[in-house]
Regions:
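Conserved beta-strand-centric core segments of catalytic alpha/beta enzyme folds
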Residues: 97-148
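Short Gly/Pro-enriched loop/turn and capping motifs at secondary-structure junctions
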Residues: 63-65, 88-90, 120-122
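A short linear-motif detector with a strong N-terminal bias
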Residues: 35-38, 92-95, 106-109
Length: 148
């Protein structure tokens, strides 16, 4: 049995194999601005809530354009969607705790937050948390790194 990956030329003229990660950006974008708003609106219906019931929306920081589209489609004011992608980029599943640490560590307050992660494998989910922000740690920056 040969377990070596087979190289193939893809439609974008790049040679890839099963070990290479490749995302179909437009499909993920369409998913993000179509399925995620539906998920959020379905959540409102299921929980008998609306956008006004949450202090902030902690959303996966895919890109700013997607965040703005979600804001528009779900009628969420942008000032209720903290943004960290401009400073930290797309951190995948880490983007939600990163937003929490970036925006809420300095001042203790009780908040009701809507959280939603979406992306890899076209997966998505959402929920709410009630939190006192004094339990959120600040971001720790360091020059340390791990050697292979």
């Amino acid at each position: 049995m040969d377990l070596q990956p087979v190289d193939e030329l893809w439609s974008d003229d790049i040679v890839r194999n099963d070990y290479n990660t490749h995302m179909k950006g437009m499909a993920v974008f369409e998913f993000s601005i179509t399925d995620v708003p539906k998920l959020i609106n379905d959540f409102y219906k299921e929980t008998n809530t609306s956008s006004e019931d949450y202090h902030y929306y902690i959303l996966h920081q895919a890109n700013l354009y997607i965040l703005k589209q979600l804001s528009r489609k779900c009628k969420i004011p942008m000032d209720k969607i903290p943004v960290s992608i401009d400073r930290f980029g797309n951190n995948s599943s880490n983007s939600i705790p990163l937003v929490l640490s970036d925006h809420f560590h300095a001042k203790a307050q009780d908040l009701r937050l809507f959280i939603s992660g979406f992306g890899a494998g076209l997966s998505w989910g959402c929920g709410t948390i009630n939190i006192n922000t004094d339990v959120i740690f600040p971001i720790v920056e360091s020059d340390e790194f791990y050697k292979d």
